[in-house]
Amino acid sequence: MKAGIHPEYHMIKVVMTDGTEYETRSTWGSEGAVMNLEIDSKSHPAWTGGNQQLMDRGGRVSKFNKRFGGLGL
């Protein structure tokens, strides 16, 4: 790799929606930073089979449903 052009990796803590924590290497944040996930593999319908509702962050889901809810599939 070319020196001086790649971001530095460091250890961060990731906190999943159920409170589970793990450490990983990342270029996000700084050494020891904490990343709190809003949606992860335990809460996203794509991985849970669609049994759970998505949390409506900032009204985006409501706005989508209002606009396209009547289409039906």
Swiss-Prot record:
Known function: Binds the 23S rRNA.
Classification via InterPro entries: Ribosomal_bL28/bL31-like_sf (IPR034704), Ribosomal_bL31 (IPR002150), Ribosomal_bL31_A (IPR027491), Ribosomal_bL31_sf (IPR042105)
Species this chain originates from: Rhizobium johnstonii (strain DSM 114642 / LMG 32736 / 3841) (Rhizobium leguminosarum bv. viciae)
HAMAP family per the UniProt record, alphabetical: Ribosomal_bL31_1
One CC-aspect GO term: ribonucleoprotein complex
GO BP terms, alphabetized: translation
One GO molecular-function entry: rRNA binding
Protein name: Large ribosomal subunit protein bL31
Protein family according to the UniProt entry: Belongs to the bacterial ribosomal protein bL31 family. Type A subfamily.
Pfam families per the UniProt record, alphabetical: Ribosomal_L31 (PF01197)
Keywords, comma-separated and alphabetical: Ribonucleoprotein, Ribosomal protein, RNA-binding, rRNA-binding
Electron transport among keywords: no
Subunit structure: Part of the 50S ribosomal subunit.
